[in-house]
């Protein structure tokens, strides 16, 4: 893997050298709720989540590391065969990996680099088609997204093709920063930050982001110490990040292994989710309590209509 520079000169993405062997690149979005009932409790009726979800850019292949990540019950994985996309032919090993993950209820997305709009659309479309035909993936993760107005037609064309091949398929975009707002109509989830904690602390958030549910945004924060972990997670939630990955790893590939505090990170996100679900359940229960009094009238109506003694007398000081 090597760090490359984005069109603005900043270090933006990690891509595989073409000469490297096929690798498995997985992003595991982890629902840290444990049961289907817990998942449903954490979702509002419009599909937005009350909880953060951890996702893992697992740019590693070691079976032990994969097993450690998998124990967190991933819900979404992003599969990259060649460092650019689906490769030139199906790989039996990865078919087996995908089948096992799907049998466990995991959603699989196929990784495809767009090279900031420079990769031919036909090549990206071929990735989407081949991923579905060879591995039965559910959706596509478009990496190295340009995010500017001039390239929007290119990404809309890709999204249109993906939906023709796989109606309703989820599309993730990774511009590594906030794109133009119009890109929210292209991607279901947009990775709006990818960088160090030092940069993240003062990273700007456009005002328009507050109009979207957290489940529409993902953020990756690396070079984050154990002492900074909790603060990073709180910042991510306050900045509308429904999906978050924080790691102490740094260097040319901070995704070479799981964070040293992976277990603690998973526990922290899960505990925070439990608090949010419990708080929401309490608020819902309170909203369903019977109105005061035995007439079925609301407190305000009863008091306004002169029923003070019966319904409101106990409030008199």
Which residue stretches match the model-derived regions?
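Secretory pathway export signals and precursors
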Residues: 47, 269, 299, 306-308
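Short, hydrophobic alpha-helical membrane anchors of single-pass surface/secreted proteins
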Residues: 22-26, 296-301
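Glycan-processing catalytic domains of CAZymes
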Residues: 19-23, 34, 40-287
């Amino acid at each position: 893997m090597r760090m490359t520079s984005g069109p603005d000169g900043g270090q933006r993405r990690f891509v595989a050298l073409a000469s490297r062997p096929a690798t498995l690149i997985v992003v595991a979005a982890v629902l840290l709720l444990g049961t289907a009932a817990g998942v449903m409790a954490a979702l509002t009726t419009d599909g937005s989540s009350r909880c953060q979800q951890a996702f893992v850019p697992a740019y590693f292949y070691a079976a032990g590391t994969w097993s450690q990540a998998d124990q967190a019950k991933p819900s979404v994985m992003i599969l990259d065969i060649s460092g650019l996309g689906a490769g030139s032919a199906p790989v039996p090993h990865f078919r087996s990996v995908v089948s096992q993950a799907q049998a466990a209820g995991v959603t699989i997305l196929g990784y495809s680099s767009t090279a900031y709009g420079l990769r031919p659309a036909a090549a990206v479309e071929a990735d989407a088609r081949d991923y579905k035909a060879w591995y039965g993936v559910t959706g596509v993760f478009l990496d190295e997204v340009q995010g500017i107005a001039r390239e929007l037609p290119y990404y809309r064309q890709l999204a249109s093709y993906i939906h023709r091949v796989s109606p309703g398929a989820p599309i993730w975009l990774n511009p590594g920063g906030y794109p133009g707002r119009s890109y929210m109509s292209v991607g279901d989830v947009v990775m709006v930050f990818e960088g160090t904690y030092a940069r993240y602390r003062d990273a700007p958030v456009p005002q328009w982001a507050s109009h979207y549910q957290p489940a529409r945004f993902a953020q990756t924060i690396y070079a984050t110490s154990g002492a900074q972990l909790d603060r990073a997670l709180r910042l991510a939630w306050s900045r509308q990040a429904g999906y978050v990955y924080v790691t102490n790893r740094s260097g040319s590939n901070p995704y070479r292994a799981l964070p040293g505090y992976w277990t603690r990170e998973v526990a922290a996100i899960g505990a925070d989710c439990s608090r949010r679900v419990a708080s929401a359940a309490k608020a819902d229960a309170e909203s369903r309590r019977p109105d005061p009094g035995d007439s079925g009238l609301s407190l305000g109506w009863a008091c306004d209509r002169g029923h003070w003694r019966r319904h409101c007398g106990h409030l008199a000081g």
